Amino acid sequence: MKQYLALCERIINEGVWVENERTGKRCLTVINADLEYDVAANEFPLITTRKSFWKGAIAELLGYLRGYDNAADFRKLGAKTWDANANENSAWLNNPHRKGHDDMGRVYGVQGRAWAKPDGGVVDQLRKIIDNLSKGVDDRGEILSFYNPGEFHMGCLRPCMHTHNFSLLGDTLYLNSFQRSCDVPLGLNFNQVQVFALLSIVAQITGHKPGKAYHKIVNAHIYEDQLPLMQEVQLKREPFPSPKLSINPDIKSLEDLETWVTMDDFEVTGYQHHEAIQYPFSV
């Protein structure tokens, strides 16, 4: 929690004003932020200086791991995060690759589970990683990448958190996650939860102990209309201790994740928080 607040302070003190063409708003920006999460100690990085939500983040992650390409499937899991991008993005609505209502195209999990090969067929990156790690194998290339520039035109959105690199040292599994851009007041809580949960889940189904997860953000920013609430409200609050994340121990394989797992299989305990803050969202 303290590293989150330290990043917010750094952006305010050191950030450079950048005009964002997509949103038409200015944002204070810093380049390169490194966060780490102690998954072994189960210090779940849920923001405590405002009421924050975690279920949608894990539900979205589960949809990625299943390779979903339809917003309706994400809604069934409990994540509404793809509704607007799938159905309200004018460029995507007019894209000939869009298959209809709720279609997201070849984004995120599709790339992770079915990366198209130039000579035909697909690569299931996640399956390869799980198979290797389950055998105790780390080939120094246990990488799950959603970033495929050759197919950006076939999806509604480029990935922000785009690459996850797993590493095995003895019986302890580590994760390095890479993110190109982050709206820190709104988006980082979501991203932190996903990085932490991804390492927890993969360690559990491959039979390893989780170590630390390392989260690199390239472009970390706060929008101009978010600054007053960040400076005058959130940064003046004292953080509470981190809560804990529990995952159903019966989840033991990728097939379990693909078939029967729901949000009822995850629980957060010990979550103390301040009141919610309604930060402006930039579309």
From Swiss-Prot:
What keywords appear on the UniProt entry?
Answer: Cytoplasm, Methyltransferase, Nucleotide biosynthesis, Transferase
Q: InterPro entries this protein is in?
A: Thymidate_synth/dCMP_Mease, Thymidate_synth/dCMP_Mease_dom, Thymidate_synth/dCMP_Mease_sf, Thymidylate_synthase
What does the record give as the reaction this protein catalyses? dUMP + (6R)-5,10-methylene-5,6,7,8-tetrahydrofolate = 7,8-dihydrofolate + dTMP
Where do transmembrane segments lie in this chain?
none
Query: Which positions in this protein are listed as binding dUMP?
Result: R22, R180, S181, C182, D183, N191, H221, I222, Y223
MF terms from GO for this chain are: thymidylate synthase activity
Q: Which residues bind (6R)-5,10-methylene-5,6,7,8-tetrahydrofolate?
A: D183, S282
Q: Where in the cell is it found?
A: Cytoplasm
- What pathway is it annotated to? Pyrimidine metabolism; dTTP biosynthesis
Q: What is its EC number?
A: 2.1.1.45
Question: Active site: which residues?
Answer: C160 (nucleophile)
Biological process (GO) annotations held by this record are:
dTMP biosynthetic process; dTTP biosynthetic process; methylation
Q: Which CDD domains match?
A: TS_Pyrimidine_HMase
| Chief site of localization | cytoplasm
Top enzyme category: transferase
* Gene3D superfamilies assigned to the protein according to its UniProt record, in alphabetical order: Thymidylate synthase/dCMP hydroxymethylase domain (3.30.572.10)
| Function per UniProt | Catalyzes the reductive methylation of 2'-deoxyuridine-5'-monophosphate (dUMP) to 2'-deoxythymidine-5'-monophosphate (dTMP) while utilizing 5,10-methylenetetrahydrofolate (mTHF) as the methyl donor and reductant in the reaction, yielding dihydrofolate (DHF) as a by-product. This enzymatic reaction provides an intracellular de novo source of dTMP, an essential precursor for DNA biosynthesis.
Q: Which NCBIfam families match?
A: PRK01827.1-4, thym_sym
Q: Which family does it belong to?
A: Belongs to the thymidylate synthase family. Bacterial-type ThyA subfamily.
Q: How does it assemble?
A: Homodimer.
Q: Which HAMAP family match?
A: Thymidy_synth_bact (MF_00008)
Name the chain's protein: Thymidylate synthase
- Organism annotation: Shewanella loihica (strain ATCC BAA-1088 / PV-4)
